[in-house]
Regions:
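A residue-level signal for conserved active-site and pocket-lining positions in enzyme catalytic cores
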Residues: 10, 77, 133
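C-terminal cap/substrate-recognition subdomain and adjoining C-terminal extension
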Residues: 1, 80, 86-243
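Active-site catalytic microenvironments for nucleophilic, acid-base chemistry
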Residues: 21-28, 127, 169
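Catalytic cores of large soluble enzymes that bind and process phosphate-bearing ligands
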Residues: 13, 69, 155
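Non-catalytic pre-domain segments flanking phosphatase-related domains
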Residues: 1-8, 23-36, 240-243
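A metal-dependent, Asp-based hydrolase signature
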Residues: 17-18, 30-102
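Asp-based phosphoryl-transfer active-site loop
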Residues: 1-18, 190
Length: 243
């Protein structure tokens, strides 16, 4: 069986599902904005002005998010998760939207593997007709209250474990399979398959691809800006953004 493994945030979705969920929780007065303002605002400002690191912003955001949703009842969380995918689920890259449809038409398995919360990943998987999915598990107690305990899926080590589980479940031929990712957390996913695609890759991911001769030789790099989609190889020239 041939599979196509897709990361979601920054690969399919043009933003972060966790970010959108966080904003909606604040909008519906389920979380205190002051915590976001105190812990995340400055990191976002630096990233937004392109003088800060996106990973630092996401790290601050994720930590704040995990702390903030502790104690939130599942019924409220599910309501907001539904709204996020209903209102934002179509904000995807044209290239990966096209490739999801292409893989389905070829009879390939489409599998979403994301570091976003499983309750968001499951909804995106359903919306885009994915065959299976895996996200970060946000645990609840017996009463359906979020505990703040997480089994993460945003790092390369855990994504590797998930792919091996999917391979056993579906008898996947990795040499013929595809993977799509945008950050260094996707590196093992790209290394495992015969057809890796880096979508608007971060500098860290791009440098990792360049330093791995085997991976560099088989990776297609896709850059989508405005209404143009570019396809380049790992030898693409980059320009230092610090002046």
């Amino acid at each position: 069986m041939i599979a196509a493994f897709f990361d979601i945030d920054g690969t399919i979705f043009r933003n972060s599902l966790l970010t959108e969920h966080f904003k909606k929780l604040i909008k519906y007065d389920l979380l205190d904005f002051s915590e976001y303002d105190r812990r995340v605002k400055e990191a976002f400002k630096l990233w937004d002005e392109r003088v800060g690191n996106y990973d630092n912003y996401l790290g601050d955001l994720t930590g704040t998010y995990v702390d903030a949703i502790k104690g939130l009842p599942t019924k409220y969380n599910d309501f907001v998760a539904d709204k996020v995918v209903e209102l934002k689920g179509n904000k995807v890259y044209a290239y990966t939207r096209k490739m999801i449809k292409w893989h389905k038409a070829q009879g390939h398995l489409v599998i979403f593997i994301s570091g976003s919360p499983d309750f968001l990943v499951s909804r995106m998987a359903k919306k885009w007709n994915a065959d299976d999915f895996c996200g970060s598990t946000y645990h609840t107690d017996k009463s359906g209250i979020l505990t703040g305990e997480i089994s993460p899926m945003w790092d390369s080590k855990n994504k590797l474990k998930s792919i091996h589980k999917f391979c056993e479940k579906y008898q996947i031929d990795l040499d013929k399979s595809y993977a799509y990712g945008d950050t260094h957390g996707d590196i093992t996913m790209l290394q495992l398959v015969g057809n890796p695609k880096a979508i608007n890759p971060s500098l860290e991911l791009l440098n990792s691809i360049k330093s791995d001769k085997k991976l560099a030789s088989k990776t297609e790099i896709i850059i989508e800006r405005k209404d143009v989609i570019y396809s380049v190889d790992a030898n693409v020239k980059t320009i230092d953004s610090t002046f």
